[in-house]
């Protein structure tokens, strides 16, 4: 009698960025680390995805986006009883200590400075998803 082990499903990351280039970069970095990635181009679309798929293990979002900033998305996620446990990581090309502190105080797990590197992704995933 043999027992089959069912592989663990890949952790699911929602990547949010209005830049197609940045979405592609972060998506490739995450996929190369064996994560399932859904990419969207706005905070509004991210909330739509989250309303349909509760199996998201982490959100990584750009800070500066039109309509809804990454900070606004962070606040909406952390205010939601259903979503507040999902870790949110913000990223920006601007290294603004005030902005970074504000995001961390609002509940962000981390704040990455672009360009995001493979070492950032592995550190993040080990610290945030695997905890």
Curated annotation (Swiss-Prot):
PTM section of the record: Two-component system major event consists of a His-to-Asp phosphorelay between a sensor histidine kinase (HK) and a response regulator (RR). In plants, the His-to-Asp phosphorelay involves an additional intermediate named Histidine-containing phosphotransfer protein (HPt). This multistep phosphorelay consists of a His-Asp-His-Asp sequential transfer of a phosphate group between first a His and an Asp of the HK protein, followed by the transfer to a conserved His of the HPt protein and finally the transfer to an Asp in the receiver domain of the RR protein.
Signal sequence extent: none
InterPro entries: ARR-like, CheY-like_superfamily, Sig_transdc_resp-reg_receiver
Single Gene Ontology BP annotation: cytokinin-activated signaling pathway
GO cellular component: cytosol; nucleus
Triggers of expression: By cytokinin in roots and leaves.
Location(s), subcellular: Cytoplasm, Cytosol; Nucleus
Modification 4-aspartylphosphate, positions: 62
Response regulatory domain ranges (all copies): 12-129
Protein name according to UniProt: Two-component response regulator ORR3
Organism in which the protein naturally occurs: Oryza sativa subsp. japonica (Rice)
């Amino acid at each position: 009698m043999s027992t089959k082990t069912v592989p663990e499903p890949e952790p699911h990351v929602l990547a949010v960025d209005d830049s197609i280039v940045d979405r592609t970069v972060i998506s490739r970095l995450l996929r190369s680390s064996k994560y399932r990635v859904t990419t969207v181009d706005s905070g509004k679309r991210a909330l739509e995805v989250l309303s349909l798929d509760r199996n998201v293990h982490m959100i990584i979002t750009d800070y500066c986006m039109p309509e809804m900033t990454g900070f606004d998305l962070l606040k909406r996620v952390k205010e939601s009883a259903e979503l507040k446990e999902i870790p949110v990581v913000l990223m920006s090309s601007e290294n603004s200590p005030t902005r970074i502190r504000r995001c961390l105080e609002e509940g962000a797990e981390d704040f990455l400075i672009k360009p995001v590197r493979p070492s950032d992704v592995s550190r993040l995933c080990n610290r945030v998803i695997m905890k």
